[in-house]
Amino acid sequence: MNVLLTSVGRRAYMVKYFKEVLGNSGKVYVCNSDDKSIAFKYADEKVISPLIYDKNYIPFLIDYCKKNAIDIVISLFDIDLLVLARHKKEFEEVGTKVIVSEPQIIEVCNDKWKTYNFLRDNGFNAPLSFLKMDEIIDKIAVGELSYPIVVKPRYGC
């Protein structure tokens, strides 16, 4: 089994893990847009890829998978997940399975507001969340919300 780890970056430990598990039954291929990726040192094969949002990224990966008989693709970077998920069928057409959730699930996980609504709509406890700072200030002013509060961007950390 040949495995391609995308956006491998500094995750050399993941490359080592897959090499150990695969043993002699396949190769670990890695790609990253930065040629200084430390993980390149540990892979069986390495390639510099276009950036994730580059229009050539998916065609590049599909062609690479086809040429190297890649069986599965696993991304090691959350930003890559949605891009790969939207193109799963194209990879399957060349015999490659992308190990990734469905796009709608990734969209919920990547968006704190969608995550909050999903949790609330499905009966889970979730901290109050607001889209606008004005809403928070108004709630504090009328005593419906008090400090401490946590303010985070909708996307990212």
Regions found by a protein language model. Give the residues of each.
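Active-site nucleotide/adenylate-binding loops and adjacent lid/helix of ATP-dependent enzymes
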Residues: 106-157
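ATP-binding N-terminal substructure of ATP-dependent carboxylate-amine bond-forming enzymes
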Residues: 1-99
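Short, glycine/charge-rich beta-strand/loop segments that flank catalytic centers
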Residues: 74-84, 101-108, 130-137
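Short beta-strands and strand-loop turn motifs
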Residues: 98-101, 152-153
